[in-house]
């Protein structure tokens, strides 16, 4: 089968266009959250300061903004080294005709923030994003009398505490968020993982990839029968491609059937990549190239 793929040649014209470099100046970039969010830090690390940026309340709003032409790029968290992948982002990538064109990894350094004059013993309630609460689980387990409430964003939690001016409230967010909203750091070492990092993806509505892109993300659906996943993974093995990640999400309304998300090394111009994608397309359902970056 794999010899046949090679004899037939590789996939024909790709639906993606190669570009020398992504535009990183004078572009419109959207991130989810408020000023001081980790997404904003990732945006600045990737694009710099010569951009026009704005923020939205939810992740789907960010993808909607680029789909509607309000922004050129969106910055979204996709995976954390402690809490794992962000499942909702994977689902949203399928609902919108948007594509990954870059990634940025930043270190996450959570702080416990409170109103000026507040003390650790004053705290009764703590607010943050659900991922941040998970990342600080061991610390929070030492304070079981605290009520935990998940909000849409870590910086949004800092903003709430600042607006309420209640010394019994605290937020888990970055030091930058604390400075932005005038909060004080009540405790610093609150994350059990000293190298806690989050990978953010840069998303566009353009099917483009940089000439030196070296990672590809795809997704596909498989029937629930013996050997189906093994057969798909064989395309990576026989084309000598290094798969760096695989995740699965249940298919709505189809018990015990899954959609798989795979990251592997390569460039869409590589013959081995084209052969593998062709083989996967023939065996899997609803295969989509999410991006090459």
Model-derived segments and spans:
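Domain-level signature for soluble enzymes in the chorismate/prephenate branch of the shikimate pathway
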Residues: 1-293
């Amino acid at each position: 089968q794999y010899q046949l793929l090679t004899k037939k040649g590789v996939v024909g014209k790709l639906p993606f266009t190669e570009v020398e470099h992504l535009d990183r100046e004078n572009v419109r970039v959207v991130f989810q959250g408020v000023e001081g969010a980790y997404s904003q830090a990732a945006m600045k690390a990737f694009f710099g300061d010569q951009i026009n940026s704005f923020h939205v309340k939810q992740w789907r709003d960010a993808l909607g903004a680029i789909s509607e032409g309000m922004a050129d790029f969106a910055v979204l968290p996709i995976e954390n080294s402690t809490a794992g992948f962000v499942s909702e982002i994977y689902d949203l990538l399928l609902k919108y005709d948007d594509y990954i064109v870059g990634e940025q990894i930043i270190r996450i350094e959570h702080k416990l923030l409170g109103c000026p004059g507040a003390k650790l013993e004053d705290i009764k309630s703590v607010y943050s994003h659900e991922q941040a609460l998970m990342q600080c689980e061991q610390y929070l387990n030492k304070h079981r009398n605290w009520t935990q409430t998940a909000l849409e964003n870590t910086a949004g939690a800092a903003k709430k505490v600042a607006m309420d001016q209640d010394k019994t409230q605290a937020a888990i967010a970055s030091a930058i968020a604390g400075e932005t909203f005038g909060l004080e750091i009540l405790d610093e070492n609150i994350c059990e993982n000293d190298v806690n990092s989050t990978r953010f993806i840069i998303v566009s509505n353009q099917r483009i990839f940089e000439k030196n892109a070296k990672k590809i993300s795809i997704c596909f659906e498989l029937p629930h029968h013996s050997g189906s996943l093994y057969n798909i993974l064989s395309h990576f093995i026989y084309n000598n491609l290094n798969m760096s990640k695989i995740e699965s999400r249940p298919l709505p309304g189809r018990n015990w059937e899954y959609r798989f998300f795979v990251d592997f090394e390569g460039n869409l111009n590589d013959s081995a990549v084209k052969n593998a994608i062709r083989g996967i397309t023939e065996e899997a359902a609803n295969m989509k190239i999410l991006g090459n970056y």
